[in-house]
Amino acid sequence: KMLTSRTLHGVMQNIRDIVNLKKSEFWNKGGPAWQKIAVCLVFDGIDPCDKDTLDVLATIGIYQDGVMKKDVDGKETIAHIFEYTTQLSVTANQQLIRPHDDGPSTLPPVQMMFCLKQKNSKKINSHRWLFNAFGRILNPEICILLDAGTKPGHKSLLALWEAFYNDKDLGGSCGEIHAMLGKGWKNLINPLVA
């Protein structure tokens, strides 16, 4: 739950940075910027899914426990899809962040789709769900893939988007990953981080 919360809260902060842009030929035309962004979560199987993570998703409104069916009209369910627009976020420390005013520090509405696959079919199958299912319907300009636990830096998603927007011949891009060193670099004591 901490890893998913860290990533989702970082994404929502990045969307806030995009919404707060004052000068933009793309984001400020044809409606609010947040309406041009969709966050898709794909979880690989109900059984391996951490129940505390589902509680976090229920807290922000994207998951509803008790509405899933194992089969419909005798056919086994392949995936459960939830859709919701929320301004709620949960930090990695499990603090609930709510909208407080219309100021620049308030998180904007974020359109979310959550696909919980019935069976664990591995990561590549999850990518296929994103590109073949959601991608065909949404027809996005770009897709940014993040693993749970990855915290996008300040304006990092905007920087990735700008790379594609400014170069129509660009086919792929990647960000830079930094280890989270912790306060006073205390995480360097852990040999896996160091």
Swiss-Prot record:
It holds the Pfam family Chitin_synth_1. It comes from the Eukaryota. It is an enzyme of class 2 (transferase). It catalyses: [(1->4)-N-acetyl-beta-D-glucosaminyl](n) + UDP-N-acetyl-alpha-D-glucosamine = [(1->4)-N-acetyl-beta-D-glucosaminyl](n+1) + UDP + H(+). Keywords: Cell membrane, Cell wall biogenesis/degradation, Glycosyltransferase, Membrane, Transferase, Transmembrane. One of its GO terms (cellular component) is cell septum. GO terms for biological process: cell wall organization; chitin biosynthetic process. It is found in: Cell membrane. Its main location: membrane. One of its GO terms (molecular function) is chitin synthase activity. It is a multi-pass membrane protein. Polymerizes chitin, a structural polymer of the cell wall and septum, by transferring the sugar moiety of UDP-GlcNAc to the non-reducing end of the growing chitin polymer. Belongs to the chitin synthase family. Class III subfamily. This is Chitin synthase 2. The lineage of its organism: Eukaryota, Fungi, Dikarya, Ascomycota, Pezizomycotina.
